């Protein structure tokens, strides 16, 4: 997997959020560091095709991601800073619902949901309603939904926000394991 940002710029009126960025990423973990307003989330949103660049391009294995359309989005797992969920759904129901939206076959989804619930440490609360979860537990459910389709590119915007120190360690280990087979952008 190779993702390239080619002279990428994103402007909002007179404000330049991303300015002529050129870089190449392959499998592994990449962390974006910068002050608030530095363009990290904007860059992630462009990578996830939620924003179009003002100029420049983003390619995946040599193809423009905006031209790839659903072919590209099938390679992608995304956890935004703030994500929506149905508060009345249980963790398991929420993940099954998201799996169906991602086109994961029901038999595969059932197995994958069980596996991911365990991986992110939510087995004991799998049947609890989302509205009853702590902020850290909701975040872990969000991480699980991003991984449902076994993405080749995993984009996680502030993934450890709300996680306690032990969960941060578990998360770092999980990301290390996942990055062997995919590109992970934090």
PLM regions: where:
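Walker A (P-loop) phosphate-binding loop of ABC-type ATPase nucleotide-binding domains
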Residues: 35-39
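Conserved ABC ATPase "signature" region
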Residues: 96, 100, 107-125, 176
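Catalytic Walker B motif of ABC-type/P-loop ATPase nucleotide-binding domains
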Residues: 154-157
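Conserved ABC ATPase signature
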Residues: 129-133
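Conserved catalytic loops of ABC-family nucleotide-binding domains
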Residues: 174-186
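Conserved ABC transporter NBD signature motif
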Residues: 56-67, 71-72
């Amino acid at each position: 997997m190779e993702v390239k940002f080619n002279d990428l710029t994103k402007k909002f009126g007179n404000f330049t959020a991303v300015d002529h960025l050129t870089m190449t990423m392959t499998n592994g973990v990449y962390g974006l560091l910068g002050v608030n307003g530095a363009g990290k989330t904007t860059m992630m949103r462009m990578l996830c095709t939620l924003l179009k660049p003002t100029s420049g391009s983003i390619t995946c294995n040599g193809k423009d991601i905006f031209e790839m359309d659903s072919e590209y989005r099938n390679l992608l797992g995304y956890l935004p800073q703030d994500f929506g969920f149905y508060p009345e759904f249980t963790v398991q129901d929420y993940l099954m619902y998201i799996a169906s939206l991602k086109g994961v076959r029901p038999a595969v989804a059932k197995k994958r949901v069980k596996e991911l619930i365990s991986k992110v440490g939510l087995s004991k609360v799998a049947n609890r309603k989302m509205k009853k979860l702590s902020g850290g537990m909701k975040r872990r459910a969000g991480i699980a939904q991003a991984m449902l389709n076994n993405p080749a590119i995993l984009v996680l915007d502030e993934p450890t926000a709300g996680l306690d120190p032990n969960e941060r360690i578990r998360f770092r280990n999980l990301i290390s394991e996942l990055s062997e087979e995919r590109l992970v952008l934090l």
